[in-house]
Design a protein with these regions (language model features):
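Juxtamembrane segments of multi-pass membrane proteins
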Residues: 490-621, 625-629, 640, 730
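Small-residue-rich transmembrane alpha-helices
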Residues: 353-358, 363-365, 389-421, 432-458, ...
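Short cytosolic juxtamembrane segments of multi-pass membrane proteins
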Residues: 3, 457-476, 848-863
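Membrane transport/envelope proteins' first extracytoplasmic loop
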Residues: 2-346, 358, 377, 417, ...
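N-terminal Sec/SRP start-transfer signal
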Residues: 1-32, 385, 474-515, 757, ...
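C-terminal transmembrane helical bundles of large multi-pass transporters
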Residues: 685-687, 703-810, 814, 818-821, ...
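Interfacial "coupling" helices/loops that link adjacent transmembrane helices in transporter permeases
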Residues: 8, 12-18, 350-390, 732, ...
């Protein structure tokens, strides 16, 4: 008996393959979209983590004003938890690689254990006269070409490298330049245009400019566990590094003191000899010789000055631009994945309801016969559950594996444009995600079939064998509007009645098409929201051209001297204190870049702090101006109080005087009085700068750094804008994927509904053909109500899209990034038009099914 039902089920699949595929397709689409987007972040992070582990990307980067020697490296290598340590050289130089113009090249020494190079083409250097070039900056030259260090470099730069002509022997990728972007330099144009790696013996210096460390860590990329390991290890690394550097500094001081002592002894001896010679009446030539010896010793003494105590900088991966951007990119993908698939599963359930209800109504007689033959309700129900369940399971598995492979691959291909990472993303199999997908699929297919089948099987076999009585006709709302109803044609009246005749199909169509439109509205609006962030931040809020960081705090005299010395290129400067602090409220703590500018009356030339038409100025003492994104994450608003703590553990409570619009990074502003009274600081370590004229900002920034040794770095605002624009540009691929999936959703819904309508009205359509209706008229009989429902659904989708977009934006929470949630009229118009286009394409495909209806066969009696 079970074999017979199984055969019947298989025959049913073959005879109604279109319906079977419709359920399979909508499930595959929903699962693929859900699993594919959900696993994309994990796949991206796994690929990035594997690459960084293979290249042994540093955990700590150490820099010192004194440099490092081999003993320093050995001391760190022997420290607890340190697994590898490499000293490294770096120098920027003007180079020529065969082009017409010189460009800024950055030379790195090749390290053995940390930051390993990934060879893409050619080979690695074998001697000091060879180099490899980073693939991200490989333009204008080729393997075999020669890179020449230009004579126009400073003498220190020329002396830094052993050879001034280097042969390019390979192309590499380095984890140091994971993200392709702009890097500033103190020379030339101010922008690094080529990056080269050479053997360590190509450098002449005895001291390394930096040191890279790898330490024992646990946890994945960007995980809290990894961050905890770094936080626990950093004090020990800093202690060992400071001890080693200070010990060498003391050796240098001792050597200088010994030299000074020796020079002083020489001076004293010369003075004694001169005194004796003068008393003895020695000739002038002898006296001059003694004086020359004394002056020489004095010059040596004057030259032997004790250097300032060294400063040590311990940096982590978090300070690496590419590392941070990769984190933000993957987080945005994950946020979007949490929302979109809901529609697909909901529509899948409605498609299954419509399909299985229609199938069981068509097979009432067959069900009645099976009951009369002794088949139990459970056995009969199992036949239909097998039909929907097999379709759902196949669709789920197909969608899962295609989605978890396809979506990460497509998204990765877009991000690969901006990152020096492996060409292929690693495949991630997530059992938990697959089980969730299967559970939801079975609920939407077998669960729905069980609910639909129970009501049908409550009737007796005799009732089921007889045809079901047609539903009693109901007047719709339009029929009650007599003036309008009378003016409709016969076919138009049929269309109106059919629109509201089947409630499940009506809601499936409205939800499916409305969901399609809402998805497109959301995708297009997301694109606009993302793309507008950089322009809003750097054109309407941050108005400065560059930000200069100083090694030592500036006095008022230093600030005046800076402006006087750079008067030709600097139009204005806003001097400030800038430092990272922790801000807490409602049990939540975030890191913030705290700024305390000196208000010299031209604050508006550098910043425009505003929100909802309100302009904000510098806070009063005891107050804080906070950016909107951080305020939202802390759950605070104007008038609330927050706790702020600096790196020296000074803690104070400040009142929020305003919350201003800000989109990139976490920023807050306080007065100089608050800085001094609450944190005991009077530092001026940074300046926001506006340049004169329309000259190249990179050249002007390089000139600033060349002219002032106290400037450690100049950040160009336009470079930051370009980097964020590039980062958000890569999200366009997600917008395209969402639109394509929305089109597929519309097609499946329309195909399924049209297929059912044609099957139900096959005798009506055949009758129309016999009566002489043209093909277009017969097609319109079916498609007219589809078109009406498509328009209704699209209009509903426009409204739904507004709320859907707001919900999606609320889910996108990335630290240091905020977005304005808005939908433009163009978004609505494009979404509506695309939905109608998708519906029209579906109708073109379904015309063939109507044209194949055989009039004579279709008009035969169903009895």
């Amino acid at each position: 008996m079970k074999k017979s039902l199984l055969k019947t089920s298989l025959r049913e699949i073959r005879s109604s393959f279109g319906r079977f595929i419709a359920i399979l397709a909508i499930v595959a689409l929903g699962v693929g979209f859900f699993a594919g987007l959900m696993v994309s972040e994990e796949a991206m992070l796994k690929t990035g983590e594997t690459y960084l582990d293979e290249q042994n990307f540093y955990d700590f980067r150490l820099m010192s004003t004194l440099g490092f020697d081999d003993d320093d490296v050995a001391a760190l290598r022997d420290a607890d938890e340190v697994t590898a340590a490499d000293g490294a050289y770096q120098v920027d130089a003007l180079v020529s690689d065969g082009g017409d113009e010189e460009k800024v090249g950055r030379f790195h020494s090749i390290t053995e254990d940390v930051n390993k190079l990934a060879l893409k083409d050619g080979r690695l250097p074998e001697n000091a006269g060879e180099c490899v070039v980073d693939s991200s900056f490989f333009e204008g030259a080729g393997i075999g070409d020669t890179v020449t260090i230009a004579d126009g470099n400073s003498q220190d730069t020329l002396d830094a490298l052993e050879n001034h002509e280097l042969k390019i022997v390979g192309v590499v990728e380095s984890p140091l330049y994971m993200r392709m972007g702009r890097y500033s330099s103190e020379i030339g144009s101010g922008e690094v245009e080529a990056i080269y790696f050479v053997p360590a013996d190509a450098f002449t210096s005895e001291y390394y400019t930096e040191m890279y460390l790898s330490v024992n860590t646990s946890g994945g990329l960007y995980s809290d566990e990894y961050d905890d390991c770094i936080d626990d290890t950093e004090p020990d690394v800093t202690k060992v590094a400071e001890g080693s550097v200070n010990a060498r500094y003391q050796e240098i001081v001792d050597e200088i003191n010994d030299g000074r002592k020796e020079a002083q002894e020489g001076i004293d001896k010369a003075n004694d000899a001169l005194e004796l010679a003068e008393k003895a009446g020695a000739p002038d030539s002898q006296l001059e010789e003694i004086r020359a010896q004394r002056d020489e010793a004095q010059e040596v003494l004057d030259d032997l000055t004790i250097p300032e105590a060294p400063e040590l900088y311990v940096l982590t991966r978090d300070e690496d631009v590419g590392f941070q951007f990769f984190k933000s990119d993957s987080a945005i993908v994950s946020s979007i994945a949490k929302v979109f698939p809901v529609f697909f599963f909901l529509v899948a359930a409605l498609v299954c309801v419509t399909t299985m209800t229609r199938m069981m109504n068509e097979q009432r007689t067959q069900i009645g016969v099976l009951k009369s033959m002794g088949y139990s309700n459970a056995s009969i129900l199992m036949k239909y559950m097998t039909y929907s369940g097999s379709s759902g399971i196949i669709g789920c598995l197909l969608g899962y594996f295609l989605g978890t492979w396809g979506f990460p691959t497509i998204i990765w291909s877009a991000y690969r444009t901006y990152y020096a990472l492996p060409d292929q993303v690693l495949y991630v199999f997530n059992w938990q995600l697959l089980l969730i997908s299967l559970a939801v699929t079975l609920l939407c297919t077998i669960g729905v079939t069980w609910i639909c089948g129970r009501s049908a099987l409550t009737q007796s076999a005799a009732e089921l064998i007889r045809p079901k009585a047609p539903k009693a006709g109901k007047r719709n709302l339009l029929e009650r509007v007599t003036p309008v109803w009378k003016r409709l044609s016969f076919l138009q009246k049929i269309t109106v009645r059919n629109l509201f005749r089947y409630k499940a199909r009506f809601f499936m169509m409205i939800l499916g098409i409305g969901g399609c439109t809402a998805l497109i509205v959301t995708a297009l609006a997301l694109q606009d929201n993302f793309m507008g962030v950089s322009d809003l931040q750097y054109n309407e809020i941050d108005l400065y051209d560059a930000n200069a960081s100083f090694n030592e705090s500036l006095s008022q005299e230093d600030m005046d001297a800076f402006l006087d010395a750079n008067g030709e290129r600097v139009a204005g400067a806003l001097f400030t204190y800038t430092g990272n602090m922790d801000i807490s409220a409602n049990g939540t703590t975030h890191s913030v870049s705290m700024n305390a500018p000196i208000d010299n009356g031209d604050l508006g030339d550098f910043f425009s702090w505003h929100a909802d038409g309100t302009e904000y100025s510098l806070p009063e003492d005891g107050e804080l101006l906070l950016d909107r994104g951080l305020a939202d994450r802390l759950g605070v608003q104007t008038g609330d109080e927050v706790t702020v703590r600096d790196s020296d553990m000074h803690e104070t409570t400040l009142k929020i005087c305003g919350v201003y619009d800000n989109y990139i990074s976490n920023n807050a502003y306080i007065s100089r009085g608050t800085l001094e009274n609450a944190f005991g600081k009077t530092d001026v370590n940074s300046a926001f700068i506006n340049f004169k004229g329309d000259g190249d900002v990179h050249e002007q920034a390089a000139a600033l750094m060349n002219a002032d040794d106290n400037i450690t770095n100049v950040t160009i605002a336009s470079d930051n804008q370009s980097m964020f624009t590039d980062m958000l540009d890569s999200l366009n691929i997600i917008v395209i994927v969402v639109i394509l999936c929305a089109g597929a959703l519309a097609f499946i819904v329309l195909y399924n509904l049209t297929n059912i309508n044609i099957s139900e009205r096959i005798r009506e359509i055949a009758t129309l053909k016999v009566l002489g209706f043209y093909s277009n008229e017969a097609n319109a009989y079916v498609f007219r109500e589809n078109t009406a429902l498509t328009v209704f659904g699209a209009l509903a989708g426009l409204v739904l899209g507004k709320f859907f977009h707001a919900f999606v934006m609320a889910q996108i929470v990335v630290d240091g990034l905020s977005f304005d949630a808005y939908v433009t009229p163009q978004n609505y118009a494009i979404a509506f038009v695309l939905t109608i286009v998708f519906a029209f394409i579906t109708q073109l495909i379904m015309r063939r099914k109507i044209s194949r209806i055989h009039m004579a066969e279709s008009l035969k009696s169903v009895e």
